[in-house]
């Protein structure tokens, strides 16, 4: 491991210390919570910063693993239009990543979903068995 790799590993460890980044891949439906900082100017001229969180849920169509510059592309349909947004995996703006559904696909990049709509754009769901310690007792 060279100096650059060790530097990246230290920074990744620092950025993920208070975050849990799950294992996900292309085809999975994720919910990404993003921190948004709004800036407004009050009547007396002072600047006011407000912080809020916004959720973005969609299908991961591409994932790029490149150390600290890793990113993933999420696609969703909003008001009948396809919207894609790229998130940096280790960015401080990304508050949390939750996997909603696991999908079954045979490709690493799902760019073909851009040309499809309706039933042909659906992805089969992969069922993950619940671990024994997480099982709900009835």
Curated annotation (Swiss-Prot):
Keywords: Ribonucleoprotein, Ribosomal protein. The keyword Transmembrane helix does not apply. SUPFAM superfamilies: Translation proteins SH3-like domain (SSF50104). GO terms for cellular component: cytosolic large ribosomal subunit. Transmembrane segments: none annotated. The keyword Electron transport does not apply. One of its GO terms (biological process) is translation. GO terms for molecular function: structural constituent of ribosome. Gene3D superfamilies: 2.30.30.790. It comes from the Bacteria. This protein is located at the 30S-50S ribosomal subunit interface and may play a role in the structure and function of the aminoacyl-tRNA binding site. Belongs to the bacterial ribosomal protein bL19 family. HAMAP family: Ribosomal_bL19. PANTHER family: LARGE RIBOSOMAL SUBUNIT PROTEIN BL19M, RIBOSOMAL PROTEIN L19. This is Large ribosomal subunit protein bL19. It comes from Rickettsia canadensis (strain McKiel).
């Amino acid at each position: 491991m060279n100096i650059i790799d060790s530097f990246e590993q230290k920074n990744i460890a620092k950025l993920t210390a208070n975050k849990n980044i799950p294992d996900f891949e292309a085809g999975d439906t994720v919910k990404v919570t993003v921190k948004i900082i709004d800036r407004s100017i009050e009547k007396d001229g002072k600047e006011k910063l407000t912080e809020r969180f916004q959720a973005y849920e969609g299908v991961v169509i591409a994932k790029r693993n490149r150390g600290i510059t890793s990113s993933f592309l999420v696609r969703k349909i909003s008001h009948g239009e396809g919207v894609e947004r790229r998130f940096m995996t280790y960015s401080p703006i990304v508050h949390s990543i939750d996997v909603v559904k696991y999908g079954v696909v045979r490709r690493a990049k799902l760019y073909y979903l851009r040309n499809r709509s309706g039933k042909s754009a659906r992805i089969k769901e992969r069922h993950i068995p619940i671990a024994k310690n997480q099982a709900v007792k009835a």
